[in-house]
């Protein structure tokens, strides 16, 4: 990638010129080929209208977490401290891989024993592609949406697919 300021030949994908330290981040950006790609690259996460976060404190029991997930028909809960800061996420996957056992004593243990601590998050202003990349790279089905460090909501793979499908309906018909 040739620097437009000094003509230095940088490695492809370089963020900064190796010679003059000029910002190169805008030079190697992919261009959208269709409406779906453009939406993923340009639309913010807020476009998905993230569902409101359902939260519990770390001391809530697994039983309470399951009851909340059933009551709100959701696949994941955000675990927040007394100041409202995100400390973890408890998902259906956590329930199946960490809690499920013949030992029912787990039901009254704190959800913090089984949650995924410090989960990956997105901001409402992040691009859909950024969120999708985090989901794909980490194997996540849910991502908390934080604004100023506080949980604002959550997006899911289903939300992404619903958005892409809505764009494709007009692409093919």
Model-predicted segments: where are they?
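Tandem CBS (Cystathionine beta-synthase) repeat/Bateman regulatory domains
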Residues: 1-173
């Amino acid at each position: 990638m040739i620097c437009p300021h000094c003509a230095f030949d940088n490695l492809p994908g370089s963020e900064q010129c190796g010679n003059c330290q000029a910002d190169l981040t805008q030079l190697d950006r992919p261009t959208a080929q269709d409406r779906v790609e453009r939406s993923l690259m340009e639309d913010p996460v807020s476009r998905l209208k993230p569902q409101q976060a359902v939260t519990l404190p770390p001391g809530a029991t697994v039983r309470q977490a399951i009851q909340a997930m059933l009551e709100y028909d959701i696949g994941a809960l955000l675990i927040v401290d007394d100041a409202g800061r995100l400390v973890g996420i408890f998902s259906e996957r956590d329930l199946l891989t960490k809690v499920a056992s013949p030992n029912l004593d787990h039901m009254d243990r704190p959800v913090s024993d089984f949650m995924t601590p410090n989960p990956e998050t997105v901001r409402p202003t992040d691009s859909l592609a950024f969120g999708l990349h985090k989901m794909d790279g980490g194997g996540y089905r849910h991502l908390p949406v934080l604004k100023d460090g506080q949980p604002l909501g959550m997006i899911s793979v289903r939300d992404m697919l619903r958005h892409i499908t809505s764009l494709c309906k007009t692409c093919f018909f």
